[in-house]
């Protein structure tokens, strides 16, 4: 068993997230946002910067806290938006060794 947390609640930047995680004595982050963007929405250079910070830090990304199907999206929206997030998330999960992804449910229709 291990503890993990959504570290963007401690810091927006990845270095601060790593430090907060280590201060707790934990070694895993459920990564959601870095510098205000979801991991699957970061540009390639920013994502590689996250990977470099994680590599050798003693902390790993155990799960993606994705924006897939979240409350900010309408279930009637074009599904290609969601498909694009999935398509970007999978290779990034593989790169970081994350085995889990958290998805939400679309907002409730009025």
PLM features: residue spans?
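Short, intrinsically disordered, charge-balanced linker/junction segments flanking boundaries
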Residues: 105-110
């Amino acid at each position: 068993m291990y503890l993990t947390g959504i570290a963007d609640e401690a810091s927006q930047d990845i270095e601060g997230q790593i430090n907060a995680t280590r201060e707790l004595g934990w070694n895993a982050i459920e990564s959601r946002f870095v510098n205000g963007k979801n991991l699957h929405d970061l540009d390639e250079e920013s994502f590689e910067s996250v990977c470099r910070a994680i590599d050798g830090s003693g902390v790993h990304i155990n799960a993606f806290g994705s924006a897939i199907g979240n409350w900010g999206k309408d279930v009637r929206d074009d599904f290609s938006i969601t498909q694009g997030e999935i398509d970007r998330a999978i290779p990034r999960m593989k790169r970081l060794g994350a085995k889990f992804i958290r998805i939400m449910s679309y907002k409730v229709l009025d």
